[in-house]
Curated annotation (Swiss-Prot):
Belongs to the SmpB family. PANTHER family: SSRA-BINDING PROTEIN, TMRNA-BINDING COMPONENT OF TRANS-TRANSLATION TAGGING COMPLEX. InterPro entries: SmpB, SsrA-bd_prot, SsrA-bd_prot_CS. The keyword Cytoplasm applies. Keywords: Cytoplasm, RNA-binding. This is SsrA-binding protein. GO terms for cellular component: cytosol. Required for rescue of stalled ribosomes mediated by trans-translation. Binds to transfer-messenger RNA (tmRNA), required for stable association of tmRNA with ribosomes. tmRNA and SmpB together mimic tRNA shape, replacing the anticodon stem-loop with SmpB. tmRNA is encoded by the ssrA gene; the 2 termini fold to resemble tRNA(Ala) and it encodes a 'tag peptide', a short internal open reading frame. During trans-translation Ala-aminoacylated tmRNA acts like a tRNA, entering the A-site of stalled ribosomes, displacing the stalled mRNA. One of its GO terms (biological process) is trans-translation. GO terms for molecular function: RNA binding. Its main location: cytoplasm.
Length: 148
């Protein structure tokens, strides 16, 4: 099983405390997959919604593939369906309702020639938690610099 990372959402790790991750497939068109292979995709502003026991990703920006004739009405930031088992969707729904969590996209990657999206159940960090993260990172950098 070979995994090839395409995009990682670095802001997600800074702004949220990640509790649990899930691997989901995405429903895509042919030209979109070509664009993703060229790394012409962004998940920084993307978010995940659950509607009628189905999971969708919104605002995932997949640029138009330059060599493809595009279908009318196909937008770069259209709503795309995520593929998960029903049991996983029900688990996610229950955890969101009980613990007041959100679902965020963490990374996009290829796994055996299929595009997969790693989504995470996360809790938003407060401002003071973010400051502590920055202080911790700075001290680790200083220690590493002094070590060299």
């Amino acid at each position: 099983m070979s995994e090839h990372l395409i995009v990682k959402n670095k802001k997600a790790y800074f702004n949220y405390e990640i509790i649990q991750t899930y691997q989901a497939g995405i429903v895509l068109n042919g030209p979109e997959i070509k664009s993703i292979r060229n790394h012409d995709v962004s998940i920084n502003e993307a978010f995940v919604l659950i509607r009628k026991k189905e999971i969708y990703i919104l605002n995932m920006n997949v640029k138009k593939y330059q060599f493809a004739n595009y279908i009318k009405g196909l937008e770069e930031t259209r709503t795309r369906k995520l593929l998960l088992h029903k049991k996983e969707i029900i688990k996610i729904l229950n955890k969101i309702k009980q613990e007041n969590l959100t679902i965020i996209p963490v990374k996009l990657y290829f796994k055996n020639d299929y595009v997969k999206l790693e989504i995470a159940l996360a809790k938003g960090k407060k401002l003071h938690d973010k400051r502590q993260t920055i202080k911790k990172r700075d001290t680790e950098r200083k220690e590493l610099k002094n070590y060299k």
